[in-house]
Amino acid sequence: GVWKAPANVGLADVVEPMVRLDNAHQDDLNVDATTGKSINAIRAFAGKGTLVWGARTLAGNDNEWRYVPVRRFFNMVEESVKKSTYWAVFEPNDANTWVKVRGMIENYLTQKWREGALAGATTKDAFFVRCGLGVTMNAQDILEGRMNVEIGMAVVRPAEFIILKFSHKLQTS
């Protein structure tokens, strides 16, 4: 899945990089001491071919978004969850809708946890989904038709959640 690091992956139909990097050059590119930014080099290795060497983003010292698989997984979850819960925009902004939305997202994330995308021995260690009055919304949100959802996912370490928030505009009361 997208949560697997795209490092050490061979490139098809590539003869060799225009610039050959050795370990010393790679060390200079790997992590800039000041910014934490890394360059994921394309390197040629004898007997292995041409490989993507690294899986870091340019987020540098940001512990949450440092790795490509984390960003790719969050992008996938955000898009999937927004699309799969879009039906809710035609529903009343009430507890019944929130329970259905939470249930759908929890089922989806449970499947991703079983596939190995999330860290943790239990689903409680791997993710949480919040949606409701006094939790992610106040009375004004409900009157204005905003359903706010908060999802915490442990992609790198159990119970260390990175938060994803999104809203849908639902029917107003």
Locate the predicted segments by residue.
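Structured, hydrophobic secondary-structure cores that serve as assembly/anchoring elements
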Residues: 1-173
